[in-house]
Regions:
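PLP-dependent aminotransferase-class I/II
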Residues: 118-121, 126-187
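Conserved small/polar residues in nucleotide/adenosyl-binding loops
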Residues: 208-210
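Conserved beta-loop-alpha segment that forms the PLP phosphate-binding cup at the N-terminus of a helix
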Residues: 82-108, 117-127
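Gly/Ser/Thr-rich loops at beta-strand to alpha-helix junctions
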Residues: 62-66, 87-93, 115-118, 175-178
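Glycine-rich phosphate-binding segment of PLP-dependent enzymes
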Residues: 15-79
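Local beta-strand N-terminus motif with an aromatic residue
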Residues: 106, 165-166, 201
């Protein structure tokens, strides 16, 4: 008898909580439906068909499937371009490919959000022997931390650009292993707008986890 009463109480508690959260669940479902509708619209407008799912040679030449998935991802994440490759084995691998693809000997890379992820330290050359790193290819690395006091970020960036002409600015959205707050998309937009006003040719590379 006691067991049955406890089960009934538990059942009522679950139903009560479920009812109180029904509005939240509905909002989440609506968000999912909206995003799904957006994805299906992109697939339709990009004219994705069964032919794009056929096996390719793997050489990458005239690979319509690869070009199509790049276009779909670029539109989905509101990017100018996208490179979607299963050959990227990690986030560090993907970021390294971007850095080595853009930077050339004599260029300056400026990090605005302090120390980068530890896996990038050896890629840059600020830790380890430096063989094959950006430093090894005579690419100069500098860093500041605008997150310590974001209200004064403009002053710090302007001062850095007065001292150096940067080819690439690296912005890490996530706090990583530090105690700082993660940057919002709006804050990153403000940073990029300021940088492009100082140097339209400077590339802003923002690391965002999706």
């Amino acid at each position: 008898m006691i067991l049955n009463n406890n089960l009934k109480l538990a059942e009522n508690a679950v139903l009560s909580v479920e009812e109180s959260l029904s509005k939240v669940f509905q909002e989440r479902s609506n968000q999912v439906f909206q995003k799904l509708e957006n994805i299906l619209t992109i697939f339709k407008e990009e004219k994705v068909s069964t032919s794009h799912f056929n096996q390719s040679s793997g050489s990458g030449h005239d690979d319509i499937s690869r070009e199509k998935i790049d276009s779909v991802f670029a539109r989905l994440f509101l990017a100018e371009k996208a490179a979607v490759r299963m050959q990227f084995v990690s986030g560090t691998h993907a970021i390294s490919s971007v850095l080595f693809g853009i930077l050339r000997p004599g260029d300056v890379m400026l990090t605005l959000t302090g120390q980068p992820y530890d896996t990038l330290e050896e890629v840059i050359g600020i830790r380890g022997r430096g063989k094959g790193s950006l430093k090894d290819f005579e690419i100069e690395y500098k860093q500041i931390n605008i997150c310590e006091n974001f209200d004064s970020f403009e002053e710090k960036i302007v001062h850095s650009f007065q001292e150096n002409s940067c080819r690439l600015v690296f912005i890490q959205k996530s706090c990583g292993y530090s105690w700082r707050k993660s940057l919002t998309n709006h804050e990153i937009e403000k940073i990029c707008s300021l940088i492009h006003s100082l140097d339209p040719n400077c590339i802003c590379l923002s690391l965002i986890h999706i």
